[in-house]
Amino acid sequence: MPHVDSATLLADLDPEQEAAVRATSGPVAIHAGAGSGKTRVISRRTAYAIATGVVPADQVLVVTFTEKAAKEMVERLRSLGLPGVTARTFHAHALSQLRHFWPAWHGGAPLPELLDSKLPMIGRLARQLPGHYRFTPSKDLADEIEWAKARRIAPHDYERAAEAAGREAPIPVDLFIRIFGDYERAKARAGRIDFDDLLVETVTLLEADPDATATVRARKRWFSVDEYQDTNPLQQRLLELWLGDRDDLCVVGDDYQSIYGFTGATPAHLLRFR
């Protein structure tokens, strides 16, 4: 790997950015909005930690919220002379782990095929609803299913959980529970999983298999999470399982810009971060 000059990484930063880049150990929270140069800070901080010997490049994981952001981060790090750093979404990293561990957990069977979108399947099920409810937008139903799965709420537990959260389903609750359950069963019959299942199954596996968890933790030990205000409870739990009792975690976000709240994300994780 090419030598990276740590001084060069600090040369064009303002004082606040430099302080963030130099904070390479322990839990770090960076509150930064759009236009603040946060992507540059994340990439420089990562490069600085590697250049100063804090962590090897192959033990770093930068978590982004979109594939586009992950690709941009990889390109930025490559331009800094660091081609070996992993930058992925929660779902992409979970997928890589499931592909590795799934066969051992399921009698050698490969990981089921991933649905590109849950909307077509939900749409077909929605058309079987009575009366005008069959015209309910599939996106509204999908969002509510995502909210539930972000909290590992099964269909039969939905009514109680939604009431406790003060949440109203897009259709009468009995019909929503029917759609939710039918959707889960339809996926199982088709031998498919969705993007929510990637996280649910990874969390379930890591909670139940200490050996798998130890393997995962041995591979990555230094974490940065961008757009942390958009993490949901399931992603937060997965992050905790990846991290274990270590504290080399940097979260970056802006609690005024949470854009995924309707599917269960909350800026509370950022606001409570220690």
Question: What is each of the regions a protein language model found here?
Answer:
Residues 1-108, 112, 214, 268, ...:
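P-loop NTPase Walker
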Residues 4, 8, 50, 148, ...:
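Residue-level signal for pocket-adjacent positions within structured domains
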Residues 74-76, 99, 123, 236-237, ...:
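Short amphipathic alpha-helical segments
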Residues 115-187:
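Coupling/switch/interface segments within P-loop NTPase motor domains and analogous charged loops
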